[in-house]
Amino acid sequence: MKTELTLNVLQTMNAQEYEDIRAAGSDERRELTHAVMRELDAPDNWTMNGEYGSEFGGFFPVQVRFTPAHERFHLALCSPGDVSQVWVLVLVNAGGEPFAVVQVQRRFASEAVSHSLALAASLDTQGYSVNDIIHISMAEGGQV
């Protein structure tokens, strides 16, 4: 019997369990990615894109990218797996730099991710630079 990927299940899974689902095939990985995406709130006028193959490099079992309409930067939520034992939220400038981990989570905390996304969207709308958004997000988001 297949386990339903609820928020509670996502919060209790370890890195190996995320890797096991990725290894089970593309359908399973898609279901996992969609389960994570269902728990997140993308800011208005931002796109939310999940990785299903290796579009974003294929380093994580789950990677969801959030991008404002102007596409000058994006925030990427990356799950635990072989590369990292924790969840990380990374801000990447469109040119690749600056690049910063703005949030680290020992367990999936969708409300903290959604808060960080809303904060970045608000700062962006107010005209803050990408560097400022990184520093403020790091100070606000930090470790969860």
Curated annotation (Swiss-Prot):
One Pfam family this sequence matches: PsiB
The UniProt record lists the keyword Transcription: no
Protein keywords: Plasmid
Domain of life: Bacteria
Role, per record: In contrast to PsiB protein of plasmid R6-5, this protein is unable to prevent SOS induction for potentially two reasons: less activity and/or insufficient expression.
Family: To PsiB protein of plasmid R6-5.
NCBIfam families linked: PRK13701.1 (NF010255)
UniProt name for this protein: Protein PsiB
Gene this chain is encoded by: psiB
